[in-house]
């Protein structure tokens, strides 16, 4: 059985989140959380929370053993972008895109 957890509109770009996500894909939940704990990227904390949420969903809603859970799917999709303007020389402006992402984790036993 597969159980899903999603976090939407994180304050990090999908490109940065995918660096953490690619490292833990296919690992056991406990092993993935341990790996993320020692990463220096601030996105690792967000990814870790989503994995813990998926494991808690499996344990509380479907009475699955959290020790047996494995990350079957994990991915980061692009979310909305905040568009801002930055002043430049000679009265011009250039756009700044503040990107965000949706993180989805699917665990299975």
Curated annotation (Swiss-Prot):
Cross-referenced Gene3D superfamilies: Ribosomal protein L22/L17
Protein name: Large ribosomal subunit protein uL22
NCBIfam families the record matches: rplV_bact
GO molecular function terms attached to this record: rRNA binding; structural constituent of ribosome
Matches recorded under InterPro entries: Ribosomal_uL22, Ribosomal_uL22_bac/chlpt-type, Ribosomal_uL22_bac/org-type, Ribosomal_uL22_sf
One BP annotation, GO: translation
Protein family (similarity comment): Belongs to the universal ribosomal protein uL22 family.
Keywords, alphabetical: Ribonucleoprotein, Ribosomal protein, RNA-binding, rRNA-binding
Pfam families with a match to the protein in the record: Ribosomal_L22
GO CC annotation terms, alphabetical: cytosolic large ribosomal subunit
Iron listed as a keyword: no
Quaternary context: Part of the 50S ribosomal subunit.
UniProt function note: This protein binds specifically to 23S rRNA; its binding is stimulated by other ribosomal proteins, e.g. L4, L17, and L20. It is important during the early stages of 50S assembly. It makes multiple contacts with different domains of the 23S rRNA in the assembled 50S subunit and ribosome.
């Amino acid at each position: 059985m597969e159980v899903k957890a999603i976090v939407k509109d994180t304050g990090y770009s999908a490109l940065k989140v995918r660096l953490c996500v690619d490292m833990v894909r296919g690992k056991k939940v406990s092993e993935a959380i341990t790996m993320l704990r020692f990463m220096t990227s601030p996105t690792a904390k967000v990814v870790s929370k989503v994995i813990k949420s998926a494991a808690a969903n499996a344990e509380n809603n479907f009475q699955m053993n959290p020790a047996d859970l494995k990350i079957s799917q994990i991915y980061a999709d692009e979310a909305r972008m905040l568009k801002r303007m930055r002043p430049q020389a000679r009265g011009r402006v250039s756009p700044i895109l503040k990107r965000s992402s949706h993180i989805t984790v699917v665990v299975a036993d």
